[in-house]
């Protein structure tokens, strides 16, 4: 099996740190998103659920993430996504990461309101959006696909 797998070229589209925000125990949707992103060639660092924004930023820096994706399944925890955007701005790290938000109560309007770079409706959309954002970032920086 290992021999067969070694013939399959690995596409490294980039690194994504995923987390369900502090105060939110929901994990299933984020797990599905993680699986679909991995299948599409992303390196996914899944931090789990109830993750404070400071920890999300710390891990994103540690893994040199291209994208930070946060999930909020409760309207009461959506403010954590906003808190992350504020932290990124305050620390001067906003330009270092692409941010994506998702979760049942989230919308494109919410993403725009809090300053997130993108919103994804579901796991399939997350892959499409992530690929598009990585390609746009590569064009801006003059770099091609990561190898």
Predicted regions and their residues:
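Feature targets compositionally biased, intrinsically disordered low-complexity regions
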Residues: 13, 91, 141-143
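Non-catalytic terminal/interface segments that mediate subunit docking, oligomerization
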Residues: 1-48
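Compositionally biased, intrinsically disordered low-complexity regions
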Residues: 16, 117, 144-147
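The C-terminal output helix
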Residues: 134-147
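Cofactor-cradling patches in redox/metallo enzymes
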Residues: 30-40, 44-117, 122-131, 136
């Amino acid at each position: 099996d290992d021999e067969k797998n070694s013939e399959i070229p690995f596409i490294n589209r980039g690194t994504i740190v995923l987390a369900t925000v502090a105060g939110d125990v929901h994990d299933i949707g984020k797990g599905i998103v993680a699986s679909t992103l991995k299948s599409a060639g992303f390196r996914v660092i899944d931090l789990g659920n109830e993750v404070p924004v400071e920890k999300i930023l710390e891990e994103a820096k540690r893994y040199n993430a291209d994208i930070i994706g946060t999930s909020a399944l409760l309207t009461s925890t959506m403010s954590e996504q906003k808190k992350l955007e504020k932290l990124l701005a305050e620390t001067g790290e906003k330009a270092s990461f692409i941010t994506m938000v998702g979760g049942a109560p989230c919308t494109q309007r919410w993403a725009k309101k809090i300053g997130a770079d993108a919103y994804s409706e579901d796991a399939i959309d997350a892959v499409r959006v992530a690929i598009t954002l990585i390609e746009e970032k590569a064009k801006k920086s003059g770099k091609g696909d990561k190898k």
